A protein has these predicted regions:
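Juxtamembrane transmembrane-helix boundary motif
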Residues: 1-22, 36-42, 47, 68-154, ...
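Short, structured loop/turn "capping" segments at alpha-beta junctions
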Residues: 129-130, 161-166, 177-181
């Protein structure tokens, strides 16, 4: 029976990491959305701890993805930083607001969003080009980044999930980013928001189960790297489809895990 005990967490974390890594590398999606429900459901872990572990897996996976996107010139650092500042600031406001409202999990909502967003990318790919992106004046773009950052931050803090999905949605639809740049910028911002989140979770909730923590971090990192490299080589249309498929599968999988 004992071998089972070691093997089981490895399997759970492998699939959680795979889902999270692909989600991060392809869509700039937060690992928290995938890893937390799996750890809670299969390993019976405390939800607060699970989110902490998921967020720390996010940090490295996002950093590696961001680096890969940056090398391929698919990262808007300037606006990313502007947006990040407003995201971080308003995440605090958001989580304060959330503490005033009776705690309900907004989990189902973000999963549903993931699913819908996936369908959107398959049905209606984002085909903006880099050239079209350059057409917007720097000042307008900076203001847009701040406003969107505020919105994302509030949602992040309130829902308590890395606003990876929100960010991708807002970057592609509101700011008119090209998909690769949107994902690159989204992961870049997420590296920092996840770091802040993970640190605060561990400060409040104590240290995690290091085995599970380590496995999650490593597996997520591995898959995020694979996905990011692939994403940067792919043609926009293929990438949209791949991203969409990954999101839909993840959405369905998480819903399945939650309600079974």
């Amino acid at each position: 029976m004992h071998e089972m005990n070691v093997l089981f967490p490895v399997l759970v974390t492998f699939f959680a990491g795979m889902g999270a890594g692909l989600g991060t590398g392809f869509a700039g999606m937060s690992a928290a959305a995938v890893i937390s429900p799996m750890l809670i459901t299969f390993l019976g872990m405390d939800p607060y701890m699970a989110v902490g572990i998921a967020l720390s897996s996010d940090v490295l996976a996002s950093a590696v993805s961001a680096y890969t996107y940056h090398k391929n010139q698919n990262l808007d650092v300037k606006n990313g930083l502007v947006m990040m500042a407003s995201v971080l600031g308003f995440t605090v406001v958001g989580s304060w607001l959330a503490s005033l409202v009776p705690s309900r999990t907004m989990g189902g909502f973000s999963v549903f969003m993931t699913f819908l967003l996936g369908i959107k990318f398959i049905v209606k790919p984002v085909m903006t080009t880099k050239e079209a992106m350059q057409g917007i004046s720097a000042k307008k773009r900076a203001i847009q980044s701040i406003v969107c950052g505020v919105i994302i931050g509030l949602i992040c803090g309130f829902v308590g999930a890395g606003g990876g999905m929100m960010m991708l949605l807002i970057l592609t639809s509101v700011l008119g980013y090209e998909l690769k740049t949107a994902v690159g910028t989204s992961v870049f911002i997420m590296t920092f928001t996840a770091l802040t989140g993970a640190v605060s979770h561990f400060m409040i909730g104590g240290t995690p189960d290091w085995l599970v923590w380590g496995l999650c971090v490593v597996f997520t990192l591995l898959w995020a790297r694979i996905a990011a490299v692939f994403a940067n080589k792919a043609a926009p249309k293929t990438l949209n489809r791949a991203t969409g498929v990954v999101l839909v599968i993840l959405g369905v999988a998480i819903l399945g895990v939650k309600y079974l």
